[in-house]
């Protein structure tokens, strides 16, 4: 058993390093998400203010503060690097993986099954995609996984002291989740445990000990909640009504999508384990009486999934918390299939992975060969990127083939399918995507002008955050567009941060007396710089959809 634990620990550590650590600093930051979170934490560290989030020097109330603390600490430890920007997400994903292992050991006392569950979790497409991307979803997923483990401890406790301890841990997890992403962290655990409470007849325990969790969560959140209410009295009004009610429930909710939206998303999210999905969910339902731990996991998968499906606003990242319990279900289902000599599901899984790799290879060949004249993703000079992409998906295909042979023993090799993709994807991104969604490249190419400009403006918040991050300045101004900082711009002390196109000529005449001025525009598809009604610039640089208008200082 010790040898098993040691070999699995080494395997998981190597996998984690290859997928989650090594690629981090080699990829440019995506806008708007990564540039936003990078800059918010940089400004918090610069200001020494860990209570009120700011973006571009403006109040930014879209999220509470605990998720930023992860990123703050990462930047404090590792400096102003892309690795530091993403490490908060990686750390959270790693801790969630440890919780997956711990819960598996609590349920089954089986190190192999616990290790398999951890490997399945870490190799899921949604997990490694979001777990190496700077957003707050990995942090909230960590706290929801902690809430899941805590609640399981309350079910297994046989004494009042044990139950009390479990509910205290549940309150701590929910409190930190609330401080990371708001009331969602309170709603999801409540929804997830309802079927479990009914099935196991735990209503009395919930009524007795549930208030303990609520009190602990409130006590944990209260110092910051009071501090921000004192400094910014409108925070809670905006955060509750705009960020929760409008985003999820109202007809004008952000990211509206139909009820069935998460069906195809979930199928893609669990790759390279798609064939295990139906059987694992059915197993959790069919064996709900004989094996209540499987129904426990099923409830933590399906109830949040239904909740997010009902909500009008939807994004793929929202279902990340469902992946941890789903990985545990899949591990249990797969091991039972091996024990019962049912290998068909592993053959199907290998075939699905092989088809996925092959389809992606063919898609890259078609895109690179010019067979689709109306689709210009890569230029003729970017053939090395196409080759890199083909190699990445050839790795997916290769490990699919490996896993199909003697699949009762090698089925878990499917976890290696994404390895080359994770290591190489940063080198295969088309230049037009780089110049649209990865502004660091554009900024570095034009650093001579941007770095010496007294004023820097842009019409995109994501690009503005990238400029602020690269230039280490929070006074980047918005040009004619408010975007997601519209609320912060409404404050009287922030109105000078927005320059309209009609005011720009007059403003520019005054600004050039103080120094150079740089205006960065993100052009729409098909839009040219000739369509911009701007004062004549001393220098214009265009890289696909990003354009720099540089105005030299005038006396």
From Swiss-Prot:
Q: Which UniProt keywords apply?
A: Cell inner membrane, Cell membrane, Glycosyltransferase, Lipid A biosynthesis, Lipid biosynthesis, Lipid metabolism, Lipopolysaccharide biosynthesis, Membrane, Transferase, Transmembrane, Transmembrane helix
What EC number(s) would the UniProt record show? 2.4.2.43
Protein topology in the membrane:
Multi-pass membrane protein
According to its UniProt entry, the protein's GO biological process terms are: lipid A biosynthetic process; lipopolysaccharide biosynthetic process; protein O-linked glycosylation; response to iron(III) ion
Q: Which InterPro entries match?
A: ArnT_tfrase, Glyco_trans_39/83, LipidA_mod_glycosyltrf_83
Give the record's pathway.
Lipopolysaccharide metabolism; 4-amino-4-deoxy-beta-L-arabinose-lipid A biosynthesis
Where is the protein found, in the record's own terms? Cell inner membrane
NADP listed as a keyword: no
User: Which Gene Ontology cellular-component terms appear in the entry?
Assistant: plasma membrane
Recorded GO molecular functions are:
4-amino-4-deoxy-L-arabinose transferase activity; mannosyltransferase activity
* Reactions accelerated catalytically: 4-amino-4-deoxy-alpha-L-arabinopyranosyl di-trans,octa-cis-undecaprenyl phosphate + lipid IVA = lipid IIA + di-trans,octa-cis-undecaprenyl phosphate
Q: Where is the chain membrane-spanning?
A: 6-26, 87-107, 116-136, 178-198, 206-226, 257-277, 293-313, 315-335, 351-371, 384-404, 411-431
> What is the top-level taxon of the source organism?
Bacteria
The protein's enzyme class: transferase
What role is this protein assigned?
A: Catalyzes the transfer of the L-Ara4N moiety of the glycolipid undecaprenyl phosphate-alpha-L-Ara4N to lipid A. The modified arabinose is attached to lipid A and is required for resistance to polymyxin and cationic antimicrobial peptides.
Q: Which family does it belong to?
A: Belongs to the glycosyltransferase 83 family.
Protein name as annotated? Undecaprenyl phosphate-alpha-4-amino-4-deoxy-L-arabinose arabinosyl transferase
